[in-house]
């Protein structure tokens, strides 16, 4: 499932942020000192997000297993969603001696030498973890022939989906069986607009980009894509792909018809999944989400999903949640042992992600690896699954059907790798040109992508401005040159 905080962080992390050392205040975590652990090393981990209220209890339970298996203790310090990129930038540049962190701006910091090379550690301390990883994770996280990340195994492939509010579907008797694209979405938006005028038909925000079967060699702020339905040996501009332009025309029709909020290009309004203020939205769904089960559980109501892109393994899906070991860590081997354990030991991982057994959850008798959540399971009494450890050793909630489990296995087995998986664009020769393109894109991108302006008028204006500056052709040619070399070396 697309977690709004997760993806907001991922988007923000592409921007280099500068801040003073004071920005590293307000760390939240376990305050016990290394002296409390005797001579066992305390491994310090930085994690993104809000600290669970019962973090001390979660870590106490976890450390019983970690001490026995690894001979070390884990200390987790949380940095807030909005602060993480800025604070980790300061921590990294200051050379602080931490051990493990949720990766921020992974490729850039790996290239800078901020992270430890884990290639050899994977052969010994991380060998069990390595065996459990889909090979796509290694391909997508290899930088200049070396691997610096311990990825959280989850949705190595994912698709974009329309997620419909099941309460409103049932209340107004709306049939979504024919919805497969933006173009076929229009009739149901018309129905909800007429039947429930106070509901936002298509709930999108200013960071919205229409979904398609594209792979982005660089951040979405630039228009360059590999068209997975076209010539996959070429880098192209998404605004010059005919079907993408049709999506934009359709979105403009939605905007003019009032299906999209009028202030979408400027508003920070979010739409709570649990409320009935919206009819349909977009969500990223992967095999580890078991169809609509996770969305429905989080929303506390039925959510119906309709896929609009294919399940593809891309760099983006392999880098959603990476852990790294600091190059300055004095405990690299122990750190890797803990990450290995976290991703291979079900008792350890489930105790963190579900919380304390008996309070937060209980096993269902006669059903292997199935659990029922209890009253103690709340948002602030456990850690997140997507950014903690291997989702495939997590117990499965009772609301997941056997058919959903089988479907997930099938999706995972059939998911294809993007031809660009593992391609990392070296921007050293075109940094100023990329900045120039990004500045131009900021003038047009949001209005075009949200349907606010007529794409037949705005896209030619954008392309004329891009091509008049010289930077556009230089970056495109450099990217194509590097991509050609990448494809040549793959053969």
From Swiss-Prot:
Q: Which GO terms describe its cellular component?
A: ATP-binding cassette (ABC) transporter complex, substrate-binding subunit-containing; external side of cell wall
Q: Which SUPFAM superfamilies match?
A: Periplasmic binding protein-like II
- Cite the record's note on assembly: Exists as a monomer, homodimer, homotrimer and homotetramer; oligomerization increases with higher protein concentration.
Keywords for this protein: Metal-binding, Sugar transport, Transport, Zinc
Family matches, as Gene3D superfamilies: Periplasmic binding protein-like II
Q: Which family does it belong to?
A: Belongs to the bacterial solute-binding protein 1 family.
Q: Which residues form the signal peptide?
A: none
Please name the GO terms of the biological process aspect recorded for this protein, alphabetically. carbohydrate import across plasma membrane; protein homotetramerization; protein homotrimerization
Record's subcellular location = Cell surface
A Gene Ontology molecular function term for this protein is: protein homodimerization activity
What is the stated purpose of this protein?
Probably part of an ABC transporter complex involved in carbohydrate transport.
Name the chain's protein. Carbohydrate ABC transporter substrate-binding protein
- Which InterPro entries does this entry report, sorted A to Z? Bact_solute-bd_prot1 (IPR050490), DUF3502 (IPR022627), SBP (IPR006059)
Q: Name the Pfam families on file.
A: DUF3502, SBP_bac_8
Q: How is it used?
A: This protein has potential use in the development of vaccines and antimicrobials against pneumococcus, because of its extracellular localization and the essentiality of carbohydrate import for the pneumococcal metabolism. The characterization protocol developed for this protein can be helpful in structure-based design of inhibitors for the carbohydrate-binding proteins in general.
The residues that hold Zn(2+) are 212, 247, 252, 256
């Amino acid at each position: 499932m697309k977690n709004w905080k997760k993806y907001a962080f991922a988007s923000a992390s592409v921007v280099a942020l500068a801040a003073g050392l004071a920005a590293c205040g307000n760390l939240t975590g376990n305050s016990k000192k290394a002296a409390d652990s005797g001579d066992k090393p305390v491994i310090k981990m930085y994690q993104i997000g809000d600290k669970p209220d019962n973090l001390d209890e979660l870590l106490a339970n976890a450390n019983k297993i970690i001490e026995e298996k690894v001979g070390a203790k884990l200390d987790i310090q949380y940095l807030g969603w909005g602060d993480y990129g800025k604070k980790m930038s300061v921590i990294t540049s200051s050379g602080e001696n931490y051990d493990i962190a949720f990766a921020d701006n992974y490729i850039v910091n790996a290239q800078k030498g901020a992270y430890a090379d884990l290639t050899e550690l994977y052969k010994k301390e991380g060998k069990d973890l390595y065996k459990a990883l889909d090979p796509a994770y290694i391909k997508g996280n290899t930088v200049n022939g070396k691997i610096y990340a311990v990825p959280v195994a989850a949705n190595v492939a994912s698709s974009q989906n329309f997620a419909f509010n099941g309460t409103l579907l049932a209340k107004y008797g709306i049939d979504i069986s024919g919805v497969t694209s933006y173009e076929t979405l229009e009739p149901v938006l018309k129905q909800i607009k007429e039947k429930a005028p106070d509901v936002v038909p298509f709930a999108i925000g200013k960071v919205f980009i229409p979904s398609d079967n594209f792979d982005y060699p660089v951040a979405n702020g630039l228009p360059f894509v590999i068209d997975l339905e076209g010539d996959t040996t070429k880098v192209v501009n998404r605004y010059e792909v005919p079907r993408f332009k049709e999506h934009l025309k359709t979105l403009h029709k939605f905007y003019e018809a009032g299906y999209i909020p009028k202030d979408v290009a400027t508003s920070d309004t979010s739409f709570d999944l649990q409320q009935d203020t919206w009819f349909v939205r977009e969500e990223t769904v992967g095999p580890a989400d078991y169809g609509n089960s996770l969305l429905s559980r989080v929303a506390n109501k039925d959510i119906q999903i309709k896929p609009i892109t294919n399940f593809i393994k891309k760099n983006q899906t392999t880098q959603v949640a990476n852990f790294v070991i600091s190059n300055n860590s004095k405990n690299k081997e122990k750190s890797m042992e803990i990450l290995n354990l976290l991703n291979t030991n079900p008792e350890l991982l489930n105790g963190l992600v579900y919380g304390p057994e008996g309070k937060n959850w209980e096993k269902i008798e006669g059903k292997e690896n199935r659990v029922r959540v209890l009253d103690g399971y709340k948002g602030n009494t456990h850690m997140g699954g997507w950014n903690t450890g291997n989702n495939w050793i997590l117990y499965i909630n009772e609301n997941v059907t056997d058919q959903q489990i089988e479907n997930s296995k099938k999706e995972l087995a059939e998911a294809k790798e993007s031809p660009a998986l593992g391609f990392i664009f070296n921007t050293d020769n075109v940094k100023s040109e990329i900045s120039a393109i990004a500045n131009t894109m900021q003038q047009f991108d949001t209005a075009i992508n949200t349907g606010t302006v007529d794409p037949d008028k705005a896209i030619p204006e954008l392309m004329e401005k891009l091509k008049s500056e010289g930077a556009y052709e230089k970056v495109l040619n450099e990217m194509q040159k590097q991509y050609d070399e990448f494809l040549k070396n793959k053969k």
